[in-house]
């Protein structure tokens, strides 16, 4: 008997050391915003009182739907590895709301001041008036909630290894629905503080930006979310903005009705794949080096993929297997992005679309933002111009396509003695100059004069064919002019 007791005691100690000890659970079954037992504020305080221990906050459905906890002042920041779960979602798909409208007052975006005095709303630096705050903390889960009427729905500031899943994020007009930022408190990025977070299967509606990955946010996964803006949104800016964020994966999301579905500002090596972007002014609005855009569906926008000029003349962006159709719509929506320049080129892939850092940008740069005109950027039109940015994406030129006897000839004019990849796309209309279907690829190697010719025969019945050219480091051209097969 004594030996059994010793073995059980040893097992209990081992379980405790290995983290098998039962996590504390706090039940929220009162929607009053106070510190009495059963309130959300009380539950967060209890979890925070044990900052090294994992726990759960289970928010129950109380009364009849819709279920809402209206908070009267900022909630405590999350300081412990806790799971905060609205329990009704797993039962019926209904969300339990956490609502900030009782204490965030004002007219629209004016209720949300930025970090710089006189600035407010979306597209200014801000961490102001968030709903749920994860700062300098790891291992938090948020599920089954509707988070609404804050300036930022969820702020993840220098926070890693957290999960935001199966929530509805709505009407957070100031900063973003969810903001992942490495901001050090002074606007500087931190490289290793906001990593390996997952934002999965959420619905974002009518936030300023839907989601932001900024100031060093890296190696995060944003997947299978729906980002949508409606007429109720005072600043339909970006579905996702990546600002100085690197090595993130954005996969399988949908973006509708923004100035830009997704905008990258000088982020590097982000992988953006299998997303759908429709009814935006720009589907993608891009700068940065080493970003890859793979197998996205881009349709019904003014510009499908816009690539801006930037100060880094070596920056390159890779476009591969993207399906692009029915763009060129008259969608002039330009909140810190979009394409509203009169008479500009529109369509599938367009270089030198101006952003808010460019002198010829037309639109809002953010409320209260003042930029010295001398600091605004311009794009060089000739190779000998000074004081301007080089043409985007290495100024790589699309191949020239011709058709003869059912075969397509692609002529490449580029750098000498280099490997290039030509991707071919098809369209259902003979008059289309886009990329509705991906048909295949071929390799071309240029000679000492920088030219190459290859022949390729389509195996799929299409009415017209276009192509892009990608160099050995990953810079991709605009689409070629189409050849008609019918």
Per-segment meaning from a language model:
Residues 151-156, 173-180, 206-215, 231-243, ...:
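Short glycine/acidic-rich loop motifs that flank beta-strands on beta-rich extracellular proteins
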Residues 1-9:
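Bacterial N-terminal signal peptides that target proteins for export
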Residues 23-153, 158-160, 299, 323-460, ...:
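N-terminal, post-signal-peptide segments of secreted/periplasmic proteins
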Residues 474-486:
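Edge beta-strands of extracellular beta-sandwich domains
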